[in-house]
Each structure stands twice: as C-alpha cells, then as structure tokens.
Amino acid sequence: MKKYIIYALIPFLFACGGTKTHRSSQFDEAFAKDTRGLDILTGQFSHNIDRIWGVNELLVASRKDYVKYTDRFYTRSHVSFDEGLITVETQSDLRHLQNAIVHILLMGSDANGIDLFASGDVPISSRPFLVGQVIDHLGGSITNTTTAGNFANYLLQNKLQTRRLSNGHTVQYVVIPMIANHVAVRAQRYLPLVRKMARRYNMDESLILGIMQTESSFNPYAISYANAIGLMQVVPTTAGRDIFKMKGKGGQPSKSYLFDPEKNIDAGTSYLWLLQNKYLDGITNPTSKRFAMISAYNSGAGAVLRVFDQDRDAAIVKINSLYPEQVYRILTTQHPSAQARNYLLKVDQAQKSYRVRR
C-alpha cells in the first residue's frame, strides 16, 4: 500500500477560521492549542496505524483518495479516484469486510459531517456517490442495500484475496474496479454547477472542469496536506481570503463551506476570475493569459510573473512580446516549481478533452 503523508490528516483535526467577531480571541487561542497539539495527535494516529497495520501501511485521505477506517481501525476502505480502484480490506472476520463493502458502495457525496479521522461507518445514502461508476457482477447499478449486499457476497465468494503484513497479521481484501470512464461520470455530476459558475464569472467551463479533474479527480472529499479543500482544492488562508475579500466578506471560508460543492466551485471559479481580471490583468493574448492563469492557480500569480521578470510590469510586457506557444514552453520548462510545470501540462491536456466532449 502506498504510504501517504501524515500531514494530510491535519485538516480533519480542526476547522478553518471564520469572520472576525468578539469571539475571535477565543478562536485564536483555541486554534493555537489545536496547532500545538497537532504533532501529538497525528503522531498518535500514525502510531496506532503502525501498531495495527505495521510499518509502511499508513493510508490517509488525500486529494484523489478517499480512505475510511472502521472496526476500531482494523478494517479500511480506499477509493483511488485517480486509478479507478476500490480496495476494501480487514484484519477482522468477513462480516466486517462485507459491512465495509456495502458502506463504501453506498456512501453519499456530502463530505460535511463525515469524520474520516474517526473509526466508524459512514452513513448509507439513498443517493450513493458511486452509482454509475461501479457495476455489480451482473452488470447492474448498485443503488441500495440489497444490490450492494448481493455484490459484496459475490466478491467474498469469488474475489477474496489475502496478504501478509510486515507485522505478521493476515489481511483479507477485495479490489473493485470502477468503470473505464468513471472520471467522466463524476464530471457529469457536477456539470450543472460548473455551467452555472462559468456563466456567473464569464469563464470557460472546460477550464473549470480541467482544473477540477487535475486538482481532485472530482472527489468531493478531497483534502491535501497543504489544507486545500474540496473539488477545486481551495486553500482557505490564501485564495479563500482573497475570494471573501472580493465578495465583501471578512475572514476566510470554513472547511464546511468549502466541502459544499456549489460553494467550492464558486470559490475556485471566482479565484480564476481574480487571476484573469486582477493579478494577471495586462496580458493581452487570451491564450497566453489562460496559460498564466492555470499556472498561477497552482503556484500563485507572483511566482508565474517572476518566471519572466522580477518586476511585475516588465513581466507583463515580456509575456505580451511572446507567442502563446512560447509562454507555454517557458512555464512548463523554466518555472522553478516542478509541480507547477507539470500542473500546466495536465490541466491543458484535461481542458482539451472537455472541449472535444462538448
């Protein structure tokens, strides 16, 4: 199993800040206590998982991975939205594995109120998020406890596998492949909201979709080690503050605010608007500006402009003197951040695929 960075747990341990009120000093004090205790809490979790699962077996939620522990952490479910694979495994008996399979197949799409840090079942939803992304052994949709239970029983009887942990414990598990176009199915789910925000901010919907795919693979539970939250991976303390300021609000969006799909897509798209009309204003070629916006969504507008010149105005002049293809090449080869270089490549490719689908 891939070992994920323990700091991905941080956002689950405390909420993001809110607007300034007469309670702000109390909040700041509580926040400080939370951060001081963070190393202890994450260390305890890591130690607990290492004790139960062995070394190099720590698995936590991230941008494109949903992970839920149950059964006192002896059973866990992992959805890789990038790879299109669902792995459910247990060190307990098969009853716990069967229960975990049913719950992962029928989980909802609302991340609010779901504590991925705790060991407990996620409620079964009447509108499962994975409907249309997974089919059962008969080729049918999995929409309720009957179909999920029947499929779970089939998996236990026909697809059960075992592996040995480094601590000597035996794990029983099943791997459920998602359908080939699972990403497109998730994208379709959020298309009405994307179109709404595209109209609101006069933004190309294919750009919004390309960023969403690259940021989270349309995982509504997405969270990163940098505390970026939700479908468009908005960081409350940076982009979030800018967005709230633009909207005439104080403070920054909360975790629950950004786990709301509509508010998250609104926040991400409004940040694109800020990049286009404020931070990167002055770039005249629309294609060059789009490349700069994509790169800036990942690394910040200042970092993008400094690739061309330390002075902002000079950087704008330099960009305007280049063809879009040259801007693209420079940002994908000379940006100091490898992540930013790859980010532009990925988003541009994803955006092209959504333009074709239209």
Swiss-Prot record:
Segment forming the signal sequence: 1-15
Record keywords: Cell outer membrane, Cell wall biogenesis/degradation, Lipoprotein, Lyase, Membrane, Palmitate, Signal
A GO term from the CC aspect: cell outer membrane
Bilayer topology term: Lipid-anchor
Catalytic function, reaction form: Exolytic cleavage of the (1->4)-beta-glycosidic linkage between N-acetylmuramic acid (MurNAc) and N-acetylglucosamine (GlcNAc) residues in peptidoglycan, from either the reducing or the non-reducing ends of the peptidoglycan chains, with concomitant formation of a 1,6-anhydrobond in the MurNAc residue
Any Gene Ontology biological process: peptidoglycan metabolic process
Record lipid sites (S-diacylglycerol cysteine): 16
Subcellular location: Cell outer membrane
EC number of this enzyme: 4.2.2.n1
Pfam family of the protein (one): SLT
GO MF annotations in UniProt: hydrolase activity, acting on glycosyl bonds; peptidoglycan lytic transglycosylase activity
Disulfide bonds: none
InterPro entries: Lysozyme-like_dom_sf, Murein_transglycosylaseC, Murein_transglycosylaseC_N, Transglyc_AS, Transglycosylase_SLT_dom_1
Lipid linkage positions (N-palmitoyl cysteine): 16
NCBIfam families per UniProt: PRK11671.1
Protein family: Belongs to the transglycosylase Slt family.
PANTHER family xref list: MEMBRANE-BOUND LYTIC MUREIN TRANSGLYCOSYLASE C, SOLUBLE LYTIC MUREIN TRANSGLYCOSYLASE-RELATED
Reported function: Murein-degrading enzyme. May play a role in recycling of muropeptides during cell elongation and/or cell division.
Protein name: Membrane-bound lytic murein transglycosylase C
Organism listed in the record: Pasteurella multocida (strain Pm70)
